[in-house]
From Swiss-Prot:
Co-factor note (free text): Binds 1 divalent metal cation per subunit. Can use either Co(2+) or Zn(2+).
InterPro entries (UniProt xref): Dehydroquinate_synthase, DHQ_synth_AroB, DHQ_synth_fam, DHQS/DOIS_N, DHQS_C
Catalytic activity line of the entry: 7-phospho-2-dehydro-3-deoxy-D-arabino-heptonate = 3-dehydroquinate + phosphate
Protein name in UniProt: 3-dehydroquinate synthase
Length: 368
């Protein structure tokens, strides 16, 4: 097992990475101090892993309740969030009750938001079961739900008490979900560590095959990068925005297609290709770097050609973004591989990138 720390002073917390961690009572016990624990999971993950976590908590003498949510991004809204609140109130949960997010990014985001809101804040633990959640969304305290007009526009910063990432759970992921997680792995190399990006290029076949050793290293290095950024800028006042590389385009794809049509990681992967193209058009990266990002994204089984929402529709959607200021769209671009920054861009260059990225006719269908 590897243990990292997110250094936030009195709110610091561990990230445990390894095999068999779902059964480790010693990892959960320090963070479940009250009598009640509520596991939040979904219809897919619950049947696979909930009983194991319930057994650990029961062994600690805790009263356990499990809430099973519908599975998918399209359910990341108020009505589903209220299922968690209903369960907490029906169980008589108090301020010492610990919520446990057992699932992927949607479960983690919603559980964290519920924990932030219930009685104005209760503790929660992240137990991510998808690659995307293990390398990205479980770390950093961003929680929330979607709105029809924009992704993650309603939420709160609420740090978990711990992250327990059992890499054995990755073996049950469908290939599409595994690929979606690889988008965030690639992102971390692109924005912060060129050597890590090269390592991903060298090991992409093994990563696609979910090799245990390679996955453990990818989760470790990605969490190190994200933890370092979060420690320097918890509330996304500046540096932390670089973690949104590919997300401005990606969120527009998700909203424009309808939440759940594209997985978050698929949209981010395509968004990174678009952001790399925009970085090149503005003279920041060379054609080789742009090609490396596209090639690696495609090798990770992610889409590299965007759906045709219409250029004006893309721009409309991107204006509903947390980074936008006074109607100006902000993008995370690359100065070079391993170095990112936030900026506005000329409208003409943005439109040219969108024209270049949009899905071609069926005779020129993209490789996803």
């Amino acid at each position: 097992m590897i243990t990292l720390e997110v250094d936030l002073g009195t709110r610091s917390y561990p990230i445990h990475i390894g095999s068999g961690l779902l059964d480790r009572a010693d990892l959960l016990a320090p963070h479940v101090r009250g009598q009640h624990a509520v596991i939040v999971t979904n219809e897919t993950v619950g049947p696979l892993y909930a009983a194991r976590v319930e057994a650990v908590l029961a062994g600690l003498g805790k009263t356990v309740r499990t809430v099973v949510l519908p599975d998918g991004e399209r359910f990341k809204h108020w009505e589903t969030l209220n299922l968690i609140f209903d369960a907490l109130l029906q169980a008589g949960a108090d301020r010492k009750t610990t919520l446990i997010a057992l699932g992927g990014g949607v479960v983690g985001d919603m559980t964290g938001f519920a924990a932030a809101c219930y009685m104005r804040g209760v503790p929660f633990v992240q137990m991510p079961t998808t690659l995307l959640a293990q390398v990205d969304s479980s770390v950093g305290g961003k929680t929330g739900i979607n709105h029809p007009l924009g992704k993650n526009m309603i939420g709160a910063f609420h740090q978990p008490n711990a992250v327990i990432a059992d890499i054995d759970t990755l073996r049950t992921l469908p290939p599409r979900e595994l690929a979606a997680g690889m988008a965030e792995v690639i992102k971390h190399g692109a924005i912060a560590d060129a050597d890590y990006f090269a390592w991903i290029e060298d090991h992409i076949a093994g990563l696609n095959a979910c090799d245990t050793g390679l996955m453990a290293e990818a989760v470790r290095r990605s969490c190190e990068i994200k933890a370092s950024v979060v420690a320097q800028d918890e509330r996304e006042g500046g540096l932390r925005a670089i973690l949104n590389f590919g997300h401005t385009f990606g969120h527009a794809i998700e909203a424009g297609m309808g939440y759940g049509e594209w997985l978050h990681g698929e949209a981010v992967g395509c968004g990174m290709v678009m952001a790399a193209d925009l970085s090149h058009r503005l003279g920041f990266i060379d054609v080789e770097t742009r090609a490396r990002i596209r090639t690696l994204t495609q090798a990770a089984m992610l889409p590299v050609v965007a759906p045709d929402l219409g250029i004006d529709r893309y721009i409309e959607l991107m204006k509903v973004d947390k980074k936008a200021e006074a109607g100006s769209i902000k993008f995370i671009l690359l100065r070079k591989l391993g170095s990112a920054f936030i900026t506005t861009v000329p409208d003409a260059d943005l439109r040219e990138t969108l024209r270049h990225a949009i899905l071609k006719p069926p005779t020129e269908a993209p490789v996803a």
